[in-house]
């Protein structure tokens, strides 16, 4: 095979500086290439492509009914969809404005549907001019007009058209505009479209009434916060009970077990009281929490039980009525301590925290012991309960120097075959100005209950009074009997006023549990 050679270019005319000199350097000789080598390389490349095609066959995708294309531009469709969505949102906002206008009507207080709008206000700036902008408040009829200022000279106009700052029309309109400054809850009416003018006398009376109503509502709100509901507690009491549980003194409070006129009783499981010493005070497994109600409705007519008690007479004050509730709780604590020392079956006091008294629970497994009014006893058990009650009354009068003052079948419990006395917050000493009257009332309640229960040995109210008090008052009827009791009370009161009597030192003698006051 012939070799193909590339001919070198023919030399040009000789340069002026020499026939054999080239200003672009000496040209290199080209390498000769055989035609057979070029054809061999091309054949090898074709064979390699055939082998690759056989090893990796081309995958064909079947054409579907959908439209396909390689160079389809979708940017214009996206813009068109956004424009259509914008128009839909504007139509929705226009409908929302109409609904808002219909919903508010002519009301002075308007409800805004702004949170339900689709289009942002700046996106809706190219709306038509004839469409009313819902946020335009330049001509808002609900906004009071700005009053015309009065110059320093005190009048406006000249000649007959002079208007001073004391003009009746100007002052009336200013007073009408000032009604907007009243409290939100005060109804001032709707004066849109009306030229209302209030005189100074009417405006001042209305202003004073608005302030009075605001103060009255504040007092009612404060009273509601400090009051105690029928079966609930106020926030302060709830916080005190929470602190008892949080400190570990009580494990948990299960619920309400009794509700009275002066207090609410809750059941709780006891824990332990840490007093900073090596040994901690043991609290009963089950406790009763007596919460004295902080409302004074039931205590207003019962102050005679505590204001004439010599133990609390010096501390009683009508100027601090809320502290009377604490004195009731403290009084019951000291009375229970006296009874406990005398061996009378009664709850054991654990702790006194302001108006909350924690005691031992009389019952079992959250079930309180039944009252004598509720329990069904046999004739022998009823007779035994009567003699126990008689002994408890004598023991309470002689050893504890107390009169229950509210003893009845509702304040006596039957538990483990014994009569238990509860609710002694109103108990007083026999030297109380009405102590003997309270004792006679207790004797009447006890005598009537056991006589109705079929106890033949039950004494009458007058015989029971003499048996408990040790007095031998002889009278044919009840009126004379009460007259002699009042005479004895009067004699005792005169003796006290003449000779004086010191308050009982119960703080040293009773040895009760700690009294906690958190001011």
UniProtKB/Swiss-Prot annotation:
Location of the Protein kinase domain: 251-519
InterPro entries named in the record: Kinase-like_dom_sf, RIO-type_Ser/Thr_kinase, RIO_dom, RIO_kinase, RIO_kinase_CS, Ser/Thr_kinase_Rio3
Residues bearing PTM Phosphoserine: 8, 112, 125, 127-128
Entry comment on modification after translation: Autophosphorylated (in vitro).
Molecular functions (GO terms): ATP binding; metal ion binding; protein serine kinase activity; protein serine/threonine kinase activity
Catalytic activity: L-seryl-[protein] + ATP = O-phospho-L-seryl-[protein] + ADP + H(+); L-threonyl-[protein] + ATP = O-phospho-L-threonyl-[protein] + ADP + H(+)
Highest taxon above the source species: Eukaryota
Record's protein name: Serine/threonine-protein kinase RIO3
Organism the protein comes from: Bos taurus
Gene name of the record: RIOK3
């Amino acid at each position: 095979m012939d070799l193909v050679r590339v001919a070198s270019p023919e030399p040009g005319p000789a340069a002026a500086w020499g026939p054999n000199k080239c200003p672009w350097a000496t040209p290199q000789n080209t390498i000769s290439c055989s035609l057979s080598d070029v054809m061999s390389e091309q054949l090898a490349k074709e064979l390699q492509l055939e082998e690759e095609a056989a090893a990796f066959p081309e995958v064909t995708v079947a054409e579907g009914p959908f439209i396909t294309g390689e160079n389809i531009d979708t940017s214009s469709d996206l813009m068109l969809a956004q424009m259509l969505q914008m128009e839909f949102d504007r139509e929705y906002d226009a409908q929302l404005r109409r609904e808002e206008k219909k919903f508010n009507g002519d009301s002075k207080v308007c409800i805004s549907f702004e949170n339900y709008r689709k289009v942002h206000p700046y996106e809706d700036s190219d709306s038509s001019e004839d469409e009313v902008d819902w946020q335009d408040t330049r001509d808002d009829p609900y906004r009071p007009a700005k009053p015309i200022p009065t110059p320093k000279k005190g009048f406006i106009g000249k000649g007959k058209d002079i208007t001073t700052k004391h003009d009746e029309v100007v002052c009336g309109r200013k007073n009408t505009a000032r009604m907007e400054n009243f409290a939100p809850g005060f109804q001032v009416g709707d004066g849109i479209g009306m030229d209302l003018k209030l005189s100074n006398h009417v405006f001042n009376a209305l202003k004073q009434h608005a302030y009075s109503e605001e103060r009255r509502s504040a007092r009612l709100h404060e009273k509601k916060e400090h009051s105690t509901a029928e079966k609930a507690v106020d926030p302060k009491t709830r916080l005190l009970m929470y602190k008892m549980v949080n400190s570990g003194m009580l494990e948990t409070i299960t619920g309400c077990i009794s509700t009275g006129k002066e207090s609410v009783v809750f059941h709780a499981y006891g824990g332990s009281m840490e007093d900073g010493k090596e040994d901690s005070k043991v609290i009963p497994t089950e406790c009763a929490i007596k919460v004295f109600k902080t409302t004074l409705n039931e205590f207003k007519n019962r102050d005679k039980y505590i204001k004439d008690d010599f133990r609390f007479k010096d501390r009683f004050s009508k100027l601090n009525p809320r502290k009377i509730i604490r004195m009731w709780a403290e009084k019951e604590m000291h009375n229970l301590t006296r009874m406990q020392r005398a061996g009378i079956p009664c709850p054991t006091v654990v702790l006194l925290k302001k108006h909350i008294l924690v005691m031992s629970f009389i019952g079992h497994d959250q079930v309180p012991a039944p009252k004598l009014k509720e329990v069904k006893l046999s004739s022998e058990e009823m007779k035994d309960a009567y003699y126990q009650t008689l002994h408890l009354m004598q023991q309470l009068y002689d050893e504890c120097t107390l009169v229950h003052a509210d003893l009845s079948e509702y304040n006596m419990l039957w538990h483990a075959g014994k009569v238990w006395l509860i609710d002694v917050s109103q108990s007083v000493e026999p030297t109380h100005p009405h102590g003997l009257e309270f004792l006679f009332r207790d004797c009447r309640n006890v005598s009537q209950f056991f006589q109705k229960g079929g106890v033949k040995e039950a004494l009458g109210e007058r015989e029971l009074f003499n048996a408990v008090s040790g007095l031998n008052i002889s009278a044919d009827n009840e009126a004379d009997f009460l007259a002699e009791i009042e005479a004895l009370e009067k004699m005792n009161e005169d003796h006290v006023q003449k000779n004086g009597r010191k308050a009982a030192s119960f703080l040293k003698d009773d040895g009760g549990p700690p009294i906690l006051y958190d001011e």
